[in-house]
C-alpha cells in the first residue's frame, strides 16, 4: 500500500497496483502530506494578481504560478530547477505541482468529521455509547461530559448540563475530569480500546435476552469490530489538522471588469481560516469562556460546511443565494466526480453530426463527411505526408492540411481505407448502440447510415445525431473489426433473433415483388432459368406478379416471376420453399434467420444488402399511395351498432329492475361494445382483404391489392387496430386514470369524429404523451440499477461441476401455450440425459448444449419436461460458468470465457423498458380490453380426465367444481396430454371423467365477474350473526328500487356472519365424506343470494363476492411491475401463504382476525391470522400445499423463498417478469433474468453465529459463509447457520464487495464513510471499479490470459488483416 502523497509524485501506471484501500488519515499523516500551513484567508492580491503569502493560493506552499519561475522573478528557466528562492521562498519547478500539493490548517481545537458524526448510525456516538443528540451537545459546546470520573459515582462519558455539572461539583468537588467541545470527545475516543470493547460486547450479546437489546449491542459491535480489524484509531474521526485542496483544483479566475469567478471551496476554506484564527487569538487573550465556546461552535460548523454543506444546521449560501458546493457535493450525484468524470469521460478523436440515409452503402459501411474525417484522422494524415516526403516537419504537414491541397485528400482516402470507426447514438441502451463501420468519404456534412442498422441504434432520420469515434491502436482496430463491426452483430443479444430486420419501404417492396396476381400478364408461361424470367419481365412480356413455372436449382417450380428474381439472391443452402411465399415483415425476418443458421454470417450480410436494394427498387416501382376510398366501411356496420345499442338498453333495463348491480352493468356494457368493435373490425378486414379478379372471363377471388391492406398485411406500416379505426369504429376509449369510458366512439376517421368524440379521444391520448416522458427516465434508472447489480458477472470458468438445475416446461396462459418448451431450452445445457419416455431413446446427452435440431426432435416427440443447467444455481465463486450459461445468443455459439454476461443481461432487460407501459394497466389510448374469459373450449378431440377435482352434482345434473387447484385434461388417442385447463372454484363442467370431447366443445364455464360461495349439500339455510342493521344491510338501488342483501362490517369483533346448512330438524349437516360441519363464513361486501330457512340444492350459489370492475389483470403492469419485482418489494396486503402441506380448519378469532390452522398428516400444526374483511381463499377441510395462498392478494416473493426455496422463487420471478414483456411482444431470453435473480440471491442472513467471525443478523456473501463454515468444521467448532436472503437490486449494488463501485452508484457519502471506518480494500474485480481506476476491464480481451499476447501487422499482405488470439498467423505471445 502506498501513501497518497507519493501517489502524486509521477503518474502511476494504472496496472502497477492490485487493490485500493481507503481508511482514515491520522493528523500526523495530514501534516506529512502538507507542503505548509495556510495561515491567512487571503487569496490573491487584486492589484498584482499574485497570490498572497501564507494564503489559500500561496506560491511558497503550493508551487510557482509560471513554469520554472519563482514568484519574485529572481530565478527563471530550467537551469534553476529545484532551487528554493531565498527571497520569496518559492521552489522553481513546473506549475503542474499546484494541482498536486496539499496544504493544511492547524485547528485550534479538534473538530469532529461530520461524516462520522452525522452519517447514520453515528460512528462517534456508537463508540462512546452516546446518542447523536448528546454527542452534538458536547461538540457544539452546549453540555459537558465526564472524561474521567476518578473516585466519584459519575460514569465515564456521562453528559452533564450546566445545572447537573454545578450539582456534581458541589457534591464531589473538583475530583473528577470533565470537558466540553472537540477536545473532550477526542479524549474519550483516545481512551477506547477496540480489542477489549469487542470482547466485552460479545459477552454482553450472549447474556442479553431481549431482541431490542441484542440489536442495539450488535449495532455497536459492528463499529467496534471495524476499528478492531483495521489500522484506524477511533480518535482519528476528530480532525486536528485540516488538509487544504491543491489550488488548481479550486481555481480563482479573473473575469473582465475586475471581478473574479471562484470555486465555492475557497469561500468555505476562508470561513474556516477566519474562525480558526479568531479562536487562536481569543485563546491567547484568555477571553471569557462563553466567547470561546461560541467560537468553537462556529469553527465546528464551518468545518462541517466545508466537508458536507447542508448536512447539519443552516446551509451556507453564496452571494446568489445558492448553497455552496462542499467537498461531499463534489463526489455525489450525476454531476459528481464519480459519475461525471470517472465513469463517463469526453474523448479525443470524436465528432458528431446529423445522420441521413445511405441506401447505397453496404452493411459494413457508413458515410463520413470529408471535412470531419480530415479532422478526426489528422495525426495519421500528418504521418503519411511525412512518409511520402510531401512535408518534412509536423508544422509543414499542418500547413498543407490547413490549405486542404489535392494531395491531402488523396492521402486522407488512403488513411481511411479499412480503418474502422465507431458510430454511437445516444441513448446507448444496449451494446448495439455502438457499432463499427468502415468509413466511405463523401462531400456532404451529414453522416450516412445504413438503413438496416437503424433498428439496433433505434435511429430515424428526423434530425437524429450520432457521434463518431476513431479507434487508434492496432489492438483497438482489431477489436472494432472483429467484435463490433455491424456485420458481426446480426443477432440480438437479448433473444438471439436477427436484429437486422428490414422494415417499412423495404418490406413494402419485397411484398410487392413476391405477391401473386391472378390473371396477370403472361400467367402460365414456363422459363428455363431465373435469368430468362427476369429478361421476359424487363422486356414487358410478363408481369412481376404473374404465376409461372421456372426452373430453379434444377427443378421446375410453380412460382411467380418476382419470387424467382428473389430466389436468385438467396444462398443455395436455403431451400426454395422458404422463398416461395409472399414476403411480409415476419417472413423476411424468418428468411434472414434461416440464412444465418444455414449459410452463415457472411451470406446473411450479402443477402440483407440485396434485400435492401431490391426492396427500395420495387417499392419505388410499385408506387403505393392511399386514397380516402381505400378505407372501406363495412356495410354491416350500422345494423351491428344498432344491435349493440339494443343489448345495452336491455342491460340497462335489467339494472333498473334490480337484477344486476351497477358494477355488473358496467362490465357487461363494456364487454358488448368491445365485442361489437371486434366484429365490425373483422367485417372491415373481410371487406378489404379479398378482391375479385377477372381471369379469362371467369371470376377468381384472391388477396386484395388495396394499398392500406397491403401496408398492414406486409407489416410495412399500420396494423389491423389502425385499419379498424380508419374504416370500422374507433371503439372504447380509456380515461387517464385507466378506466374505460362506457360510451364508445362509433364513428371512424373516414366518417370523421363529432366534437364530443374528439374530446373523448384526446382525453386518454394526452395521458399517453405525458407517460412517455416519464417512462424514459424511469426505464433509464431501472437499466442503471440492473447494470450496477450485474456488472461483475463474467463467464469465469468452463464447468463449475454443479449437479442441480431447473426443470423447464411450456408456459400456459388460459389453457393456451404461450411459449413452447423449445424456445425456452434452445441453447441451454442439458442437466441430465433427455430421454423419450415412449422409446427410452436418449435425445440429448447430459451436459450437451441443446441445438435447433434437438429442439425439433424434443417437440416432435412431445417431451414437455426438460432439466437444464442455469446461471441461478451455478457454483462458480465469481461470475458464472460456460455450462450453466449455455449459448451466447448474439453469436449463436457457446459462450466464451470472459463474456460480460451480467451487463448483457441488464441491457437486454432494460433496453425494451421504454416500450413497456407506465400505466398500472396495459391498454392503449383505444381501450383494447380483452373480453373476460368465461369458458374453456377444447381445441382437440380426446377424452376428458379430471385431476385433483372435488365436485358436486348440481340441479341440472352437471358437476360444479368445489376446490381451487383442480384441472381438467384432454387426452388424445396416443395418451398424450393435449389440453390442461385450470378449473376455478364454482366452474360448471359439461363433461364427466372419461367422456369423449370433440374439438370446439365447451369443457367448463363460470362467471368471470364474481367469486361465488357454493352449497356442497342439498339442505335448508340457517343464518347465524346475520342481522339487518348490524352485520347485513339491504341496499336499495337508487335507480331501480330493488333491494340486495350485502354483508357489512360489524361494530363488535366477535360477530361472524355465517350460513349453516341444516336438515329438517335443524341439525347442522356435515360436508360430504368428512366430519366437518357445513358452514360458510360470509366475508364483508359479499351479496347474499339466499334467505333464511330457504331450501337449496348442492351446487347452488349461497353468496357472491364481486371482483373489481374489469380490473382483473390491471394491478400493476409494465415498468413499475418489473421494477417492483427486481426491487423485491413486499406488496401491500400480501397474501399469507401456508408453510406446510395439510388440512385447513378454522380456530377462534383473535382481535378480529380470523385464525386459520393447517394440520399436516404428521408433524405440528401451523396457525395463521388473516385480517378481518379479507376473503379467505380456502375452505374448511380443504387440503392445501406448502406455498398456496390462504387469502386473496398478491404474493410476497420473500415468502416464496422462505417456504419453497430459491428454485421456486426464481421460477416465479422469471414468469412474472416475462409476462410483462410478453404482453408488449418483447422477447427476452430467460437466462438474462436468471443472471439478475442470481445476483439478488447472493447473500445469506446469519441466524446463529456459532464460532464464526460473523454476527447474528449480519448479511454475508454466500461463498464467504460457506468458506467460513468449512474452516470451522476443520477446526471442530460449531458452524454458523443461515437463511437465504432475497435483496432488491439497489440493496445488492450498495452492499457489494467493491466500495468504489458502490460509491459510484448511490449514497456516495454513506458508502465512503462505511468503507473508511472499515478501511476496506477494493480488489478491483468488477468492471466499474476498473473503469474508475483507468484500467482495462477484466473481461473479454482484458482478461489476464490475453495480456501476454502482442498484436503485430504484416505489412507485406495486401489486406491489413489482423488476427486475435486463437488465430495463430500473426500473434506472438510475449515472455
Curated annotation (Swiss-Prot):
Species: Bdellovibrio bacteriovorus (strain ATCC 15356 / DSM 50701 / NCIMB 9529 / HD100)
Annotated Gene Ontology cellular component terms: DNA-directed RNA polymerase complex
Cofactor(s) named in the record: Mg(2+); Zn(2+)
Binding site for Mg(2+): 460, 462, 464
Functional summary from the UniProt entry: DNA-dependent RNA polymerase catalyzes the transcription of DNA into RNA using the four ribonucleoside triphosphates as substrates.
Subunit structure: The RNAP catalytic core consists of 2 alpha, 1 beta, 1 beta' and 1 omega subunit. When a sigma factor is associated with the core the holoenzyme is formed, which can initiate transcription.
Family: Belongs to the RNA polymerase beta' chain family.
Keyword NADP belongs to the record: no
EC class name: transferase
E.C. number(s) listed in UniProt: 2.7.7.6
One biological process term in Gene Ontology: DNA-templated transcription
Record bears the keyword Cell membrane: no
Amino-acid positions noted as binding Zn(2+) 2 in the UniProt annotation, renumbered to this chain: 800, 874, 881, 884
Superkingdom field: Bacteria
Annotated GO MF terms: DNA binding; DNA-directed RNA polymerase activity; magnesium ion binding; zinc ion binding
Annotated positions binding Zn(2+) 1: 70, 72, 85, 88
Disulfide bonds: none
Protein name in UniProt: DNA-directed RNA polymerase subunit beta'
SUPFAM superfamilies with a match to the protein in the record: beta and beta-prime subunits of DNA dependent RNA-polymerase
Keywords: DNA-directed RNA polymerase, Magnesium, Metal-binding, Nucleotidyltransferase, Transcription, Transferase, Zinc
Entry note: cofactor: Binds 1 Mg(2+) ion per subunit.
Chemical reaction(s) catalysed: RNA(n) + a ribonucleoside 5'-triphosphate = RNA(n+1) + diphosphate
